[in-house]
Amino acid sequence: MKKKLLFMLIFMFEVSLSAQSIYQHSIGGIGCTMWGVSYKTFLSDHVALSLDFGNQFVQTGGEDWPQVDVYSIELNPNLMYEFSSNSRLHSLIGAGVTLGYNWEMGIWHIWYSGGTRDDYKYLGNGMKAGANVIAGLEYLFKIPLAVQLDFRPGYGVFIKNNVRWHHFDWNVCLSVRYVL
């Protein structure tokens, strides 16, 4: 009985040692409403950290700020759990945050809609913060190239002085990365 238990423990230990992450690091580009640089690293066999840095464009359609264009520079780190459906195709799910700086909030739309000088207090530079979930697929080619397609619904807030504008911040992103 003790030999069987010892054998099973050794076997489980060897199997856990042979389990490896999909790859260690990758770097490339991301395209969606945010265009920029994407870096991904595996922290363990199935847990990955993705850092996306780039420029995002958001066009509003709410009653508070009708048709205002917001541009921002953002950092979007996501912590993901990846599981394999086969050796090359991997599913992922996770969550992340968004931190950024925004500017040029579409002043021409306020002029066009007949806005007053008081409306301009909402325009200008500010900060952006938000949270998102992420779900998608990643395909690893035989060459050192990984392509990821994901959906990122989230909640974002643009902040300038005492004004906060809340919005549904969603993306469908395509990332192409070179595997290091």
What are these regions (language model features)?
Residues 41-149, 155, 175-180:
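Gram-negative (and chloroplast) outer-membrane scaffold detector with strong preference
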Residues 4-14:
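Sec-dependent N-terminal signal peptides
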Residues 20-35, 47-57, 153-155, 159:
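Transmembrane beta-strand segments that form the barrel wall of outer-membrane beta-barrel proteins
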